[in-house]
């Protein structure tokens, strides 16, 4: 284990993740540095490299007209977060996250940020509930459905494409889970309306998302994150989120700050990835995908340290 300064419990200094990642990119041997405990806080960053311009089969584009997801990026994401996951929190984290829902085999669930389907399949496997995973990226949804087929969960945890800016669902469900997706939606009110309509009476709504107080929104690190995030963020404050629940008569039972947990998941994943990279050779395209993905999460960490928060919201729809 190590302390917050990067030293292990015996007091020996360790090389910081930034230095190790740069050394991996340049192909340096770190053994000498590890013996001497040398490190530099000012390690230069490799020049940002553009992602390949041609999208892999299907999938949407980011705000600059480049593929939002590629096979290489998915490979990196699964190394970071675990098989079937493309955001923080793998199989071990999901039970903590969804505990308020009280999931059971009689329940139907919508997962509005399905990604590769890891959360959907974890809920279906662990609790026996019937989950429909919805994902904005066509490419991710296809890859997620392939993974559901491989696990024999094509009926219990199918992954489909949808448009969060125009959300409606033909059947009412017992629960909705939406994990760090609302922040990039422009029309949050219409999405809230759609979620409320999709819930059965006494239905559950569980969301985690990035929020920020107006006084902190102008912080440099937050602005850098907003400018460079692949999908344009449209952040609300915690109070705005709470008001959206109240306006739809959804009984908000939990509105808690889980920033420290989220930050810890990111830092632990990046450290694990760096250790993996030091043992494996990757082709140039994958190395670029690694740097792009790590930089994305480092920017999110910087925004968090500048005041952006991650909150978990849990609400109940009243009986009719």
Question: What do the predicted segments below correspond to?
Answer:
Residues 3-4, 11-17, 32, 254-320:
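Conserved Class I S-adenosyl-L-methionine
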Residues 110, 119-165:
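Class I SAM-dependent methyltransferase SAM/SAH-binding core
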Residues 106-115:
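Conserved class I S-adenosyl-L-methionine
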Residues 210-232:
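Short, glycine-/aromatic-enriched active-site segment of Class I SAM-dependent methyltransferases
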Residues 168-176:
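A short acidic, Gly/Pro-enriched loop at the edge of an enzyme's catalytic core
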Residues 2-66:
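N-terminal auxiliary segments of SAM/dcSAM-dependent transferases
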């Amino acid at each position: 284990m190590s302390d917050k300064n990067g030293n292990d419990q015996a007091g020996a200094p360790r090389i910081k993740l930034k230095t190790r990642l740069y050394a991996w990119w340049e192909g340096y041997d770190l053994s000498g540095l590890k013996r001497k405990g040398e490190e530099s806080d000012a390690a230069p960053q490799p020049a940002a490299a553009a992602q390949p311009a041609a999208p892999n089969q299907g999938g949407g584009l980011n705000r600059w007209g480049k593929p939002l997801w590629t096979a290489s990026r998915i490979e990196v994401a699964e190394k970071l977060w675990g098989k079937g996951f493309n955001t923080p929190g793998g199989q071990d984290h999901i039970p903590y996250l969804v505990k308020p829902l009280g999931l059971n085999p009689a329940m139907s669930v919508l997962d509005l940020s399905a990604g590769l389907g890891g959360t959907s399949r974890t809920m279906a496997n662990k609790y026996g509930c019937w989950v429909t995973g919805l994902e904005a990226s066509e490419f991710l949804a296809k890859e997620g459905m392939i993974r559901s087929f491989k696990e024999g969960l094509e009926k219990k945890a199918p992954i489909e494409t949808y448009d969060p800016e125009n959300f409606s669902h033909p059947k009412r469900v017992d629960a909705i889970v939406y994990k760090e997706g609302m922040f990039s939606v422009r029309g949050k009110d219409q999405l809230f309306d759609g979620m409320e309509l999709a819930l059965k009476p006494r239905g559950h709504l569980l969301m985690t998302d990035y929020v920020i107080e107006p006084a902190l929104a102008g912080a440099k690190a937050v602005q850098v994150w907003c400018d460079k995030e692949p999908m344009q963020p449209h952040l609300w404050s915690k109070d705005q989120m709470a008001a959206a629940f109240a306006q739809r008569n959804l009984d908000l039972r939990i509105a808690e700050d889980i920033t420290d947990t989220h930050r810890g998941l990111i830092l632990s994943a990046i450290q694990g990835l760096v250790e993996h990279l030091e043992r494996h050779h990757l082709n140039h395209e994958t190395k670029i995908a690694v740097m792009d993905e790590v930089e994305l999460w480092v920017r999110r960490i910087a925004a968090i340290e500048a005041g952006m928060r991650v909150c978990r919201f849990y609400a109940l729809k009243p009986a009719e």
